[in-house]
A protein has these predicted regions:
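A conserved hydrophobic position in a structured secondary element of the catalytic/binding core
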Residues: 2
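Extracytoplasmic/periplasmic solute-binding protein
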Residues: 8, 22-70
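Loop/turn elements at helix/coil->beta-strand transitions in domains of secreted/extracellular proteins
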Residues: 33-44, 104-107, 130-135
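Glycine-centered hinge/linker elements that transmit conformational signals in sensory
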Residues: 25-30, 66-96
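Aromatic-glycine-rich donor-binding/catalytic loop that engages nucleotide-sugar donors
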Residues: 5-17
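Paired acidic/hydrophobic, glycine-rich loop segments that form the ligand-binding mouth/hinge
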Residues: 107-112, 117-119
């Protein structure tokens, strides 16, 4: 998900659907900052982007097709884990939550389809309240032309 309101406030264009890790990291780095001068980071680039999203974005999986071997020692998996850690470190140890996203203080958040449905009104669910406009987009890929989707 992309918080359109936050990007507009920061004069940042909404990324294209074929964005990459480099673009994603650069935007998150720009957006993660102390906005009120109290020394505490209160605006964030991303919430809830973890190793699972990074593995999918890098086109790799945790186990071999037959399920007999763990593949974490492969270079693509290692690269994905390193990227997830790099993204996590941007928040400088701040413990983010869904509430932080709902308050409009986070620019990007990967979501499962079931989570998406709680933000979009439909007959069996009440729309979750938010004070910002948002849009959906594929997660950034490790490299150009490799659109990623959220696992799950």
């Amino acid at each position: 998900f992309i918080n359109k309101t936050l990007l507009q406030k920061e004069h940042i264009r909404i990324p294209d659907n074929d964005w990459t890790w480099d673009e994603f990291y650069s935007l998150c780095e720009q957006l993660t900052r102390d906005t009120d001068g109290d020394g505490i980071i209160d605006q964030f680039g991303v919430y809830d982007y973890g190793w699972e999203e990074a593995l999918v974005a890098n086109g790799c999986s945790l186990f071999s097709e037959d399920g007999q071997h763990c593949l974490l020692n492969q270079s693509a998996q290692e690269s994905a884990m390193q990227f997830a850690r790099k993204i996590y470190q941007l928040n400088a140890g701040t413990d983010l939550s869904e509430k932080t996203f709902d308050e409009g203080r986070v620019a990007f958040r990967p979501m499962l389809f079931s989570e998406y449905r709680s933000y979009e009104p439909y007959p069996w669910r009440i729309k979750r309240s938010s004070n910002f406009e948002w849009t959906a987009s594929p997660c950034p890929a490790a490299q150009a032309s490799a659109a990623a989707t959220t696992p799950g």
